[in-house]
Amino acid sequence: MLKTTLLFFATALCEIIGCYLPWLWLKRGATPLLLIPTGLALALFVWLLTLHPAASGRVYAAYGGVYVCTALLWLRVVDGVKLSHYDWAGAIIALCGMLIIVAGWGRA
């Protein structure tokens, strides 16, 4: 379970980086050269999705919970925004949903 969760976090981080870099370019006028690491991050994201040991729809559903938590960590660390009680509650609920889905992978 820990290995799968870490794989989900790595996958989410690649997806967020792959979306954040073009956002910097379009929204903040950063260099278009950011599109090069964007492509690499998104290619790595797709490859990491193939490493998950379940049907793709189930992987995407479980991954969503970890993505929520990773995005909130990004909000705090990169954007410098303090998380609210609602952020924490939502992250816990999303993570619990992911854990329930992953726990059932071998039983479905």
From Swiss-Prot:
SUPFAM superfamilies: Multidrug resistance efflux transporter EmrE
InterPro entries for the chain: UPF0060
Keywords: Cell inner membrane, Cell membrane, Membrane, Transmembrane, Transmembrane helix
Subcellular location: Cell inner membrane
Pfam families noted in UniProt: UPF0060
Protein family per UniProt: Belongs to the UPF0060 family.
HAMAP family in the cross-refs: UPF0060
Protein name (record): UPF0060 membrane protein KPK_2870
Source organism (scientific name): Klebsiella pneumoniae (strain 342)
